[in-house]
């Protein structure tokens, strides 16, 4: 079974829910062994959020309805709590704690980068399971193996630089490993750490200072504006649909993040069609979804 983790459970909810319902009603459209395991993202505005800037707000009832919709259909919710600039007092943020109370469930997860939130959430909301974020930027296989061996984590998202590395097939705990299939970031991007810190601080400053979430991205990470097929062509860490359902799955690596938080909706749609839908149904499903998104 290939488990897919879809982006932006809140801002991309219409598309995510449309694909989940389509899979329920027309499973013949989908690749064999395709499973929508979880949706990831944050409710706005969560200051624990990192990597992808998130503005606006979310009513508590909306958060409850969104969580229930996914969970009632067996789809897990993953909070992307990956802000690397948090201080101890930030754990008491009212909005983030409300969202945790609403969604605390043994089938839901928190994706984190350090022990601050791991310790706080595990003691305050013990039903959550945890995912180690790729934002930790582990650069060697040994470090990845150490992370996979930690009992604190149900899953570990690998740095995309490992995707082409055949050593992945020899590591232990492959059932806990998640690979990012279509990251647009350039291989070993020297600005990635700086970008994460910038976006984390920007999230903390929401409502306090003038916001310009594109400032760093446009100056240093032009790859964020590249479309799905450019990423497919130019990134050696891109995972093709053939390899995902073929060699990776055959070697016991079955969990894949589809990138798309903050991306153009039609670019995300193209990724969904590519990874989930059988070739003979792709045009039909693409049109159905474009009409649905109008």
Residues covered by each model-derived region:
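Active-site pocket-lining/capping segments in soluble small-molecule metabolic enzymes
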Residues: 1-147, 153-294
């Amino acid at each position: 079974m290939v488990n897919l983790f879809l982006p932006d459970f809140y801002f991309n909810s219409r598309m995510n829910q449309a694909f989940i319902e389509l899979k329920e009603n027309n499973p013949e459209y989908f690749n064999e062994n395709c499973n929508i395991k979880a949706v990831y993202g944050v409710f706005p505005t969560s200051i624990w959020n990192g990597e992808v800037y998130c503005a606006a707000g979310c009513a508590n009832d909306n958060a409850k309805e969104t969580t229930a919709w996914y969970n009632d259909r067996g789809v897990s919710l993953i909070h992307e709590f990956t802000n690397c600039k948090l201080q101890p007092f930030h754990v008491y943020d009212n909005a983030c704690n409300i969202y945790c109370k609403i969604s605390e469930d043994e089938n839901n997860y928190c994706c984190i980068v350090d022990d601050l939130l791991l310790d706080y959430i595990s003691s305050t909301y013990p039903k959550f399971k945890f995912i180690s974020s790729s934002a930790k930027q582990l650069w060697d296989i040994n470090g990845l193996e150490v992370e996979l061996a930690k009992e604190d984590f149900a899953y570990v998202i690998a740095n995309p630089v490992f995707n082409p590395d055949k050593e992945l097939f020899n590591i232990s705990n492959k059932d806990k490993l998640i690979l990012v299939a279509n990251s647009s970031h350039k291989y070993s991007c020297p600005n990635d750490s700086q970008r994460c810190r910038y976006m984390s601080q920007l999230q903390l400053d929401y409502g306090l200072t003038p916001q310009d979430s594109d400032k760093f991205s446009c100056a240093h990470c032009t790859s964020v504006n590249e479309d799905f097929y450019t990423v497919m062509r130019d990134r050696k860490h891109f995972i093709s649909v053939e390899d995902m359902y073929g060699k990776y799955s055959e070697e016991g690596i079955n969990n894949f993040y589809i990138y798309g938080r903050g991306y153009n909706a039609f670019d995300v749609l193209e990724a969904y069609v590519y990874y989930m839908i059988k070739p003979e149904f792709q045009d039909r499903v693409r049109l159905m979804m474009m009409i649905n998104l109008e």
